[in-house]
UniProtKB/Swiss-Prot annotation:
Name this protein carries in UniProt: Urease subunit gamma/beta
GO biological process per UniProt: urea catabolic process
Reaction equation(s) it catalyzes: urea + 2 H2O + H(+) = hydrogencarbonate + 2 NH4(+)
Chain intervals for the UniProt region annotation (Urease beta): 102-227
UniProtKB keywords: Cytoplasm, Hydrolase
Subcellular location: Cytoplasm
UniProt-listed NCBIfam families: PRK13192.1 (NF009671), urease_gam (TIGR00193)
Top enzyme class: hydrolase
Alphabetical list of CDD domains matching this protein: Urease_beta, Urease_gamma
Length: 227
């Protein structure tokens, strides 16, 4: 028997759906793959019976209820997409809310719970910064601000060992010619700066590290390094 890939997929889906039907007949509540297969198979069989797309979707939405599935399944299977062959050709059926409610919400296994908002860190230092470049410059929250773009003009000596006082993962954008006052906080942890612009590449508080970093910055043309 020669089958196309689509026909093989259809037989695989039918086998999974038959397993789901057999287990439900034994009184078992269905898991995610079983529920998904049964819903998708219902659409395909409805299409084979000559039903229209809307009718097939409605039939699939009525095949399972909250008591037919394991706890948490309704929270995972929120939509089922299946391509079925109708009388007018192949159509993609999207079955929304296929289990008919019964979700556990925040109590569902694996639910993602939003964390508490973290306040913006309080700045220990405020510096005016001017972007002398012709393009925008963005600096991220944990970048060693001392090593930020050479075309940003600010007192780099005061910014040594500091980062932006903004929430982690955010950034500050400096438009061309724009002057912005930013808040800075000391870099925490072990206070080791590796990479960035390569002006430190070691412990920030090592003897002579600040002076050497300022010398390198001035030699490389960083604005504000000679203040």
């Amino acid at each position: 028997m020669r089958l196309t890939p689509t026909e093989r997929d259809r037989l695989l889906l039918f086998g999974a759906a038959e397993l789901a039907r057999a287990r439900r007949a034994r009184g078992l509540r269905l898991n995610v793959p079983e529920a998904t297969a049964l819903i998708a198979d219902t659409v395909c069989e409805a299409a084979r019976d000559g039903a229209r797309l809307a009718q097939a979707i409605e039939r699939a939405r009525s095949v399972l209820g909250p008591d037919d599935v394991l706890p948490g399944v309704a929270d995972v299977v929120t939509e089922v997409h299946v391509e079925a062959v109708f009388d007018d050709g192949s159509r993609l059926a999207v079955v929304a809310d296929p289990v008919g409610g019964g979700g556990l919400g925040d109590d569902a296994p694996g639910a993602l719970l939003p964390g508490h908002d973290r306040p913006e860190p309080e700045a220990a230092l405020r510096l005016p910064v001017t972007n002398t470049a012709t393009v925008p410059v963005s600096v991220t929250s944990h970048f060693h601000f001392f090593e930020a773009n050479p075309r940003l003009d600010f007192d780099r000596g005061r910014a040594y060992g500091m980062r932006l006082a903004v929430p982690a993962g955010s950034s500050v954008r400096f438009g061309p010619g724009e002057r912005v006052e930013v808040g800075l906080v000391p870099i925490g942890g072990a206070r080791v700066a590796i990479g960035f612009a390569g002006l430190v590449d070691g412990p920030l508080d090592a003897p002579g590290a600040r002076e050497e970093a300022l010398r390198r910055a001035a030699a490389c043309g960083y604005l504000g390094a000679d203040r």
